Amino acid sequence: MTDPEPRPGIRLAELPLGARPCSLAAALDVLGERWSLLALREIGYGVHRFARIAGYTGASRDILADRLRKLEAAGVIERRPYSEHPPRHEYHLTEAGQELFPVMLALYQWGDRWAVDTPALTRRHSCGQPLQVDQVCHHCGQPVTHDTIHAEPASA
């Protein structure tokens, strides 16, 4: 018996595991470690120097250095020199890193609701209201939920 070929509109759950394209698994290979996400949080807040990132995250220097190297190799952050003698670098988000902003907001929102008793911060939109991140289709404006998403093979 052979596995069914993906067809337009097929739901991912209907595909055998080996046939599922898994961008999520690939993203988790880059981002899925605690210290990576916490380092990205700090860099996104404007903390660019290694010692300050280590201080705010609580990561050991060895672990943080490893995670920053991996994030740089994946193109999520870049190092920029700020001192020649001794040579020192700052860390900045690349375009790929900046595009993680909505992902981080969604994780904050989930954590505020499900992972802590009382959130440490209230995030507000520029309109003054507490931030509520929703996902909507950019084409039709309708909410995106697990039952409104259909997958089809990417065109070659």
Regions found by a protein language model. Give the residues of each.
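Short aromatic/hydrophobic contact patches that present stacked aromatics
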Residues: Y56, E90-H92, T122
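N-terminal leader segment of winged-helix/HTH proteins
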Residues: M1-L31
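Basic, Lys/Arg-rich alpha-helical nucleic-acid-recognition elements, primarily the DNA-binding modules
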Residues: M1-E5, A39-E42, R52, L71
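C-terminal regulatory/oligomerization modules of transcriptional regulators
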Residues: M1-P8, Q109-A156
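Alpha-helical linker/hinge and terminal dimerization helices associated
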Residues: L37, A74, V103-W114
